[in-house]
Regions:
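Structural motif corresponding to the early beta-alpha repeats
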Residues: 81-112
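Short acidic/His/Gly/Ser-rich catalytic and metal-binding motifs that mark active-site loops
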Residues: 17-23, 94-99, 229-231
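Short, acidic/polar
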Residues: 35-49, 108-125, 172-184
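Active-site groove signature of glycoside hydrolases
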Residues: 121-143
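Short, well-ordered coil/turn segments that N-cap beta-strands
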Residues: 5-9, 54-57, 80-84, 127-131, ...
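N-terminal binding-site loop/beta-alpha segment at the start of enzyme catalytic domains
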Residues: 1-85, 89
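Active-site mouth loops of central-metabolism enzymes
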Residues: 21-41, 100-116, 142
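Beta/alpha (TIM)-barrel catalytic core signal, keyed to glycine-rich beta->alpha loops juxtaposed to Asp/Glu
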Residues: 137-321
């Protein structure tokens, strides 16, 4: 059964393409079944559930371990499926060597050389199925904002018919969004899509994302569950999480559905990424698309965000598991 607003949910593969990630609850969700074949099979199972539920947008990245490979395997095995929008990202490399205890899991490089190499790698796996290629986690110091040759190369990809987007992370997301959306190549905007972190605890990107929507740019939000802080089973005791838990209990819905419903009710109409790693999570996230939060709940939630610097500092301390 498809949910009413399933088309506004996308499936992100950050937590499926590699054995370790910084989202909480992975030991409960995955146990020890983390081999390449375990995760390949699980990815296909979750993709099947997402597609059956009406999800038509899938988001991968070069740094998400073998996510592009797993997605390509699934697409090749489902030749009947032609209506999936496929997005991926370049700018980080996965260096975790499929280990849970790797000291470093990914390395950032926003250079022309990295773009050229990673686009070649992505196309080797996804071929013509690639619809959107995003700069991964742009910050104010990203060379993308100043390197004319790199901008020109991205513009060439845009002119070939592949959408060019960016994702943002960190406490200065609004400034990065505005700077990126001001970029033009050959007289046309470079970016047609922006993906940013937005959730009940980190809302600072909201105004800039609203401006992006007004400019005709597609808006996608990630980490709507704050890497597990706003998911069922959370052990987070911060004021914002406690308030969200109380309101979810009042509405008799799970915390993840509250988080999704709040995101979907933003006036700039984002697409919301689910980071589901189980079919049960897919079903719960889709159920969240049918929930309309009462005005008093939306008002109470609006005042619970943390200072961006504090939010991102806490996120940087999360352990990969």
């Amino acid at each position: 059964m498809s949910n009413r607003r399933a088309h506004r949910i996308g499936l992100g593969l950050a937590a499926l393409g590699r054995p370790a990630y910084l989202t909480g609850g992975r030991n409960h969700d995955l146990g020890d079944a983390r081999s390449v074949e375990d995760m390949r099979t699980l990815t296909a199972t979750v993709l099947d559930a997402a597609y059956a539920g009406g999800i038509r947008y899938v988001d991968a990245a070069r740094s998400y371990g073998r996510a592009e490979e797993f997605l390509a395997n699934w697409l090749n095995s489902r030749s009947d499926i032609t209506d999936i929008e496929v997005a991926s990202k370049w700018g980080y490399r996965y260096v975790g060597d499929w280990r849970m205890d790797s000291e470093v899991h990914e390395v950032k490089e926003h250079t022309l050389k990295a773009f050229t190499a990673q686009l070649r790698e992505t196309r080797a796996l996804l071929g013509e199925r690639l619809d959107l290629y995003q700069v991964h986690s742009m910050t104010e110091d990203s060379p993308v904002l100043s390197d004319a040759q790199l901008q020109h190369a991205l513009g060439e990809l845009r002119d070939e018919g592949v959408g060019v987007g960016l994702s943002t992370s960190g406490p200065r997301q609004p400034e990065v969004i505005r700077a990126a959306l001001a970029l033009e190549v050959n007289g046309a905007p470079l970016f047609s899509s922006v993906q940013s972190t937005w959730n009940l605890l980190e809302t600072s990107s909201g105004a800039a994302l609203s401006e992006a929507r007004d400019a005709g740019v597609s808006v996608v939000i990630k980490e709507v569950f704050a890497n597990g802080r706003l998911a069922p089973g959370t052990t987070d005791a911060s004021p914002g999480v406690r308030k969200a838990l109380r309101l979810a209990a009042e509405l008799q819905i799970p915390l993840d559905q509250l988080a999704i419903a709040a995101a979907l009710q933003q006036p700039w109409k984002p697409r919301v990424l689910s980071g589901a790693v189980t079919t049960a999570q897919v079903h719960s996230h889709l159920a969240g698309t049918d929930i309309e939060l009462p005005p008093h709940v939306a008002e109470e939630l609006a005042g619970q965000s943390e200072e961006p610097v504090e939010y991102w500092a806490a996120r940087s301390q999360r352990e990969w598991s």
